[in-house]
Every structure is written in C-alpha cells, then in structure tokens.
From Swiss-Prot:
UniProt source species: Haemophilus influenzae (strain 86-028NP)
One BP annotation, GO: 1-deoxy-D-xylulose 5-phosphate biosynthetic process
Enzyme Commission number(s): 2.2.1.7
Domain of life of the native organism: Bacteria
Functional summary from the UniProt entry: Catalyzes the acyloin condensation reaction between C atoms 2 and 3 of pyruvate and glyceraldehyde 3-phosphate to yield 1-deoxy-D-xylulose-5-phosphate (DXP).
Region forming the signal peptide: none
InterPro entries: Dxylulose-5-P_synthase, THDP-binding, Transketo_C/PFOR_II, Transketolase-like_Pyr-bd, Transketolase_BS, Transketolase_C, Transketolase_CS
Involved pathway(s): Metabolic intermediate biosynthesis; 1-deoxy-D-xylulose 5-phosphate biosynthesis; 1-deoxy-D-xylulose 5-phosphate from D-glyceraldehyde 3-phosphate and pyruvate: step 1/1
Keyword check for Metal-binding: yes
Name assigned to this protein: 1-deoxy-D-xylulose-5-phosphate synthase
GO cellular component, one term: cytosol
Presence of keyword Magnesium: yes
The encoding gene: dxs
Length: 625
C-alpha cells in the first residue's frame, strides 16, 4: 500500500509530535482533515479498526500539540482509537503493515515506540496504570504530566472506578479524559458549554477554588455551603455525571465538543497546569467524517479491506462462523426453554448474539465490560433456577478467574461458558490469543471442559453443557466452521472420546479443531486418531488402551502446552505407571504475535506439514518407527 502524500501536504511534514508543535493553531483544522482522510485510505487498504480512530482525530492532534510527548506521558485505553496517534508519532509509513505478521501492532505497544507508554489491548487498564505512572513521576520530581484517555465503554468496568477512587484519594496530578462517543452530540455540547468549561478549567478559577478551600476549611458551615453551591453550578452548567466524578475527588470539566480543535487546545492548555486529579469529559462521534461509519459505527469498528468510495463492506459468503453456530443454537434453545439466559460482557456482535438479543430480549443481558460481574451475575441466576449461558472470549474470561472458582465452581452451579476465540485469533495479536483457558480451567474442581472438532460437535457440546447441571465450558475458535452437516441435538456421554481411525504404533489424541490435520496425517503415518472431546473429565480408559496398544502418543491442541490437555494425558500415564512415549503439541511458552491464523499455525509447526515434521523428529529421537 502506498498513500499519495501529495494529497496530504501538512501531514507529510509530521514525522513526530515535535513537527506537529511547529504548526500554527490555525493550521490544525486542515491537519485534522488530512489525518482523517489518511486514516480512512490506509485502513481501507489493510483492514483494521476504523470508526474509533476517526472519532479521536481532533483529540489526538490537540493532545500532542499541547503536551510535550513523550516527556509527558499519554496512555490510551484498549487502543482501538490510537491509529491517529501512531500516524503522528513516526509510524505513518508503517501503517500498511498494521495487524500483519511482523508489522506494527494494532494497539499501543511499549516495544514499538517511546510514545506508547503502556501496552494495551484489553479495556479499562489506563487509569490504574496512569495513576502508578503519575505517582512515580511525582516521587521523582520529574515534572512530567500524565494523561489517560478512556472510552465510555471501558469506563463502565469496575477496575476503572477502583482507579478513579484511588486517584481521588491520593490527589495526584493527572488528567483523565473520557472519550464519550455516543451516536450524537448531546444538547449541552455547544458554544456556551465550551465557554463555561474554559472558565472552570482556567488557572484563575483553580487558584480561587483552592485558596477559598484553605480559608473556608476553618469555617465549616460556610465551607459546606460553598461546596454545595459549586456542585450546583456544575450540575446546572455541565452534565449530571459531574457530581459522580467530583465525589470521587476529581475536578470535572465537560462535556465539551471533542471535534472542536480550537476549544480542545485551549481547554488542554488550561488543564495542563492544574494540580490534583482532573477529569475532562468530551463528546465525540464514532466514525466522524466518513458517512458510512457514522451511520454504522459498530459495523465499521473493525473492518476488512473495502472500497472507501462505495463504503460497502465485503460480505462473507463462506461457511458459517463458530460464533453464528453458537448464536443459532442459543436461539433454538430459547424457543423451547424460557429459563435459558444469554449473557455477554459487551460482545453481542462478536459472540453471535444479535439475533438472540432481538428475538428474546427478556432472556438477554449485555452487562457491559464487566467480566467479573458477568460470571457472578450468572451465579445468581443459576441459584434462582435459571440456566445462564455466558458468551465470552477466551482472553476475557481470564479477567473473571476468581469468580469462576469462588462463585461458580465451589458451589457446583449449572453455568455454561461458551468460550469464543479459543486458540489462535490472528491479527489482534498477543493480547487476544485464546492460549490459556484450558490450562487455567483444568485445575478447577467440578468443571467440565469440552473441545469440539467441528460445528456439529460444538452444538452437541453446548447442548450437553446446558443439560448437565454442572459448571461446563465449550471452547471454540474464531472464524469459519468446517462445513459438516448439523444433526439433531443429543447429550454426549460426559468424559468419553470417539475413535475415528484405527492405525498402528502412533496414536494422535486430538483436542479441538485441528482434527482435519490429524486425519490427513493419519493416512500417511498409518496412525490411530481419537477425537478426545473432553479435557475434563478426560477419558482415562481410552488413554490407557492407547498406551497399551501403541508405541507413541501425540496430543494435539490449540492451547498452551503447559497445563493444557496434553498435560492431562501425561498425568494419566504417570498415575497409571505407563511409560509410552508422549509428544505434546500445542502453543509454546511465549506470547503469540499477530499474524493470520494460517501464518501463525505454520510458524508454530501446528499446520499439517509442521505436525508431521514434529512427529517424525520425535520418533527419530526415540530410536525407531
């Protein structure tokens, strides 16, 4: 991809924020226009996150214009909105490689740039990390400023409010910017509100406010009256949210128009010199400046390559995704059972729950970015006699580990976890790979863990988990299913595998959707293939039979080898006193970088060719075949 920089005369001059700060203020609107157009052109040719970045163009320009980055430290929450930040901080020419193998990261990444203060990917971490960074700077008398940018979705998480509460108590100098990108600018975001916000963010108001507090502290009745007066003024002039953040110890300003570059620069210039925790609430429009994205910000959140002129996203006419298979199964169950409840922590579209939410709104809950609450909410529903199904990405279930153990498993409650994005997820990289769920769930008593090899088996396992009356998890990958015929639902025998092919000497014990590679290899190696189905309880009887009748056992999974399904097989062999040679194939002991799924599997030696090479090398080391 090459962008014609003749179309971007100002942007072509910007190779770092230092270059940006050389511009006159009256040049900033043109720069914003060019930056937005460049972002659209780039992402349309490479794929990636689009709508969020389009909405933060003015904010990004204003922040780097006012603050002396990287000396002043700027922290982006999640990172979807940070593409303009990457473009302005020396990575413009590398945008063609974003989310690709060996390319720049889709999120801010410390190893990539000194301007990326915090590596991110998951939500709601910015304020906690920012507070720690601000405290460290304060103790070192560094004189640097700390700014955290968090979205209206991410700030709903409990972790964000824990950090706000702590920051208010410490009274540390830092600025939190709430990027509120609802569908439209609210009524009170206009010239008057911007003017009032400039007054409240100014140094004169701040000095008078702090000085009067010192005096009035000695006269409690007057102090309380003035405090209530100030709160009333802010409540009238600003939004109801101001009271909440003021009570947490922040000086709240806003909401203000996040697309007015002149006002943002003036506001941030004022706020840069204020002491204590500051909170700036800006209103932006997701997809700003590109009509199709403004109309459908969810559809244009993450996009494949597309034609920016037509604005039409390519349709997926291939096999259904595992997410759709799950969503269809959930609808099928809801038609028969009013007690089934579908729950998602802000992943309705990604988890395939759109149709379910529309057809069965009373049986659907989107609890926002609140994974811990999600799991314990499901616990309560189960106690109340309902049948909760938690649809959650593998990487996000990590955030609710204590709730999984303490609230679900210890009480042995019938909560079904539909774990999407298990295994290699591809372009989103290390923060989103579903590499650890088998390992961290396998050690939990009462858990049933299932690994389908295709979409029909996935449906049967979901049904089995729904019917079993215990904590159960079904893990399935991102992307398209195999294309097998779907059969009527029936409960699988728990803890039992199925023998697919009988061979000699080598037995491949498959856990999950790498089964096609195992079957392809079995013909060449005359290997036995078993679809293990259950990681827990594991089929001990089958493992012992295979160990007695074969020279080599090979376990195959898309999970970390350490603590994974292969480790469960090793434990069975050890406890049974079997000495059969065991090769465990899975994800290695490092974080898997971004690449397509096919590229990643090839690099890891988990494609058909790589698996064959690993098996043959293992046997060669053992001495014979």
């Amino acid at each position: 991809m090459t962008n014609n920089m003749n179309n971007y005369p100002l942007l072509s001059l910007i190779n770092s924020p230092e270059d940006l700060r050389l511009l006159n203020k009256d040049q900033l609107p043109q720069l914003c226009q060019e930056l937005r157009a460049y972002l659209l052109e780039s992402v349309s040719q490479t794929s990636g996150h689009l709508a969020s970045g389009l909405g933060t163009v003015e904010l990004t320009v204003a922040l780097h214009y006012v603050y002396k980055t990287p000396f002043d430290q700027l922290i982006w929450d999640v990172g979807h909105q940070a593409y303009p930040h990457k473009i302005l901080t020396g990575r413009r020419e590398q945008m063609s490689t974003i989310r690709q193998k060996d390319g720049i990261h889709p999120f801010p990444w410390r190893e990539e740039s000194e301007f990326d203060v915090l590596s991110v990917g998951h939500s709601s971490t910015s304020i906690s990390a920012g507070l720690g960074i601000a405290v460290a700077a304060e103790r070192e008398n560094a004189g640097r400023k700390t700014v955290c940018v968090i979205g209206d979705g991410a700030i709903t998480a409990g972790m964000a409010f824990e950090a706000l509460n702590h920051a208010g108590a410490l009274h540390t100098d830092m600025l939190v910017i709430l990027n509120d990108n609802e569908m439209s600018i609210s009524e009170n975001v206009g010239a008057l509100n911007n003017h009032l916000a400039r007054i409240f963010s100014g140094s004169l108001y701040s000095t008078l406010r702090d000085g009067s507090k010192k005096i009035l502290d000695k006269v409690p009745p007057i102090k309380n009256f003035m405090k209530k007066t100030e709160e009333h003024m802010k409540g009238v002039m600003f939004s109801p949210e101001s009271t909440l953040f003021e009570e947490l110890g922040f000086n709240y300003i806003g909401p203000v128009d996040g697309h007015n570059i002149d006002e943002l620069v003036a506001m941030l210039t004022n706020m840069r010199n204020l002491k204590g925790p500051q909170f700036l609430h800006i209103k932006t429009k997701k997809g700003k400046g590109y009509a199709p994205a403004e109309k459908d910000p969810i559809g244009f959140h993450g996009v494949p390559k597309f034609d920016p002129i037509s604005g039409e996203l390519p349709k997926n006419n291939s096999k259904p995704t595992y997410s759709k298979i799950f969503g269809d199964w959930l609808c099928e169950m809801a038609e028969k059972d009013a007690k089934i409840i579908g729950i998602t922590p802000a992943m309705r579209e990604g988890s395939g729950m759109v149709e379910f939410s529309q057809r069965f709104p009373k049986q659907y809950f989107d609890v926002a970015i609140a994974e811990q609450h999600t799991v314990t909410f499901a616990t309560g529903l189960a106690i109340g006699g309902y049948k909760p199904v938690v649809a959650i990405y593998s990487t996000f279930l990590q955030r609710a580990y204590d709730q999984l153990i303490h609230d679900v498993a210890i009480q042995n409650l019938p909560v079904l976890f539909a774990i999407d994005r298990a295994g290699i997820v591809g372009a989103d990289g290390a923060t989103h790979q579903g590499a650890f769920d088998i390992s961290f769930m396998r050690c939990i008593p009462n858990m049933i863990i299932m690994t389908p090899s295709d979409e029909n088996e996935c449906r049967q396992m979901l049904y089995t988990g729904y019917q079993c009356g215990k904590p159960a998890a079904v893990r399935y990958p991102r992307g398209n299913a195999v294309g097998v015929k779907l059969t009527p639902l029936e409960m699988l025998p728990i803890g039992k595998s199925r023998l697919i092919r009988k061979g000699q000497k080598i037995a491949i014990l498959n856990f999950g959707t790498l089964l096609p590679s195992a079957l392809e290899l079995s013909e060449k190696l005359n290997a036995t293939v078993v679809d293990m189905r259950f990681v827990k309880p594991i089929d001990i009887e089958m493992i012992n039979v295979l160990a007695q009748t074969h020279d080599y056992l090979v376990t195959l999974e898309e999970n970390a080898i350490q603590g994974g399904a292969g480790s469960a097989v090793a434990e069975v062999l050890n406890s049974s006193g079997k000495s059969t040679a065991l090769l465990q194939l899975g994800l290695p002991d490092y974080f898997i970088p971004q690449a397509t799924r096919q590229e990643a599997l090839a690099d890891l030696g988990l494609d058909t060719k790589g698996i064959e090479e690993k098996i043959l090398n293992f046997i060669a080391k053992q001495g014979n075949l």
